[in-house]
Structure formats: C-alpha cells, structure tokens
From Swiss-Prot:
It holds the Pfam family HLH. SMART domains: HLH. The gene is BHLHE23. The lineage of its organism: Eukaryota, Metazoa, Chordata, Craniata, Vertebrata. One of its GO terms (biological process) is axon development. This is Class E basic helix-loop-helix protein 23.
Amino acid sequence: MAELKSLSGDAYLALSHGYAAAAAGLAYGAAREPEAARGYGTPGPGGDLPAAPAPRAPAQAAESSGEQSGDEDDAFEQRRRRRGPGSAADGRRRPREQRSLRLSINARERRRMHDLNDALDGLRAVIPYAHSPSVRKLSKIATLLLAKNYILMQAQALDEMRRLVAFLNQGQGLAAPVNAAPLTPFGQATVCPFSAGAALGPCPDKCAAFSGTPSALCKHCHEKP
C-alpha cells in the first residue's frame, strides 16, 4: 500500500490500464478456446484464420420450423382420420364389449360341458356294468372305451347269429320235405279209413295208399306180429 501511495497519478492510471488489457486478453482467449477446439480461429497454412460458419438466416430458420410444424400437423391429421370420429366413444365402449364377449364365451362353454355330461350319463345308463352299485362313476375316457368294446361285442354276436341262421336255412333246404298227417280234433273217434270189404294188405302198402306218408313213419309197420 505504501508503494501504491508513492506512485503518481499518471503512473497509477497506466498501471490500471495495463491490468485491464491483460484481463481483456485472458477473457478473449477463454472465449476463443471452444472455437479453436472445433477448428475455428486457428491459422491455416497461409497464416489466415478460417472464417467461422455464417449463422443461419432468420428467414431460413423460420422456414425450417414451419416445415416441421406442417409435417407434425399432417401426421396428426392422418392419425385422427385413421382413428375416425368415434374413436373416443369406441375406447369407452371397448371394455364393456370385451366383458360381454368374455361372459358369452364362458356361458357357451358351460352349456357345452353340461350337454356333454348329460350325453355321457345317458351312455352309461345303457352300457352293462357301467351303472352297477359296486362300480364308481366312470370317467369320460373310460365310458367311451367301454361303449366301444360293448358295440364291438354286439357286432360279433350279430355276425354269429347270421351265420347260424344261414346254416340252419341251408340244412332245411337239403332235407326232404315231410307232409305231416292231419291231426284229429280232441274227443272225436278215429274213423277207420279202410272199408269192411276191402282186401287187407301189408301195413306199409295201406299207409302209403291212404295218406301218402312213408311207412317209415308208421309205428305199426315196425311192430312185430
């Protein structure tokens, strides 16, 4: 402080100007450091500093911002047209429609299962050994398998009966036809078919002449005299 007081007024002003110039130079260098890092403000091969890029004109900036806003408006208009005028109402109705659709699907599935259970109960009622007290309620798969085996067994039984009937019909066709003798009513006396004056021949001849029945069927022809 004593040294400052000893300085004259002109020297003090010169010293203050020197300090101000040094501070301004430091501030200018600090401001130019980012430009130097980007390549601006550094001398080129000829010693000239490259020119900094010219700032964009206000008209061009306004035009570009207008184009961007126009594109955004077009995109918004397209989205609005795609959604349609009732998009908000559709959004409010969608949860209720989904709930009603889910309830209808559940009700339809419940009815289908009830119908299936009723059909299986009716099938168990007509299958033997499926509704016995000693047998617990069969499952769906077991009921279907038992019904399949029962149907196959019935089909085999029908085939056996058809073969048996065909065999019996074939045996009757090969056998000689036999005429049965007329049956006399109960309580009436048998009338002798031979006249009193007719010559009596052997029993086989008489049987054949009267009724046409072979003598092999007459028990009197085989009796011993």
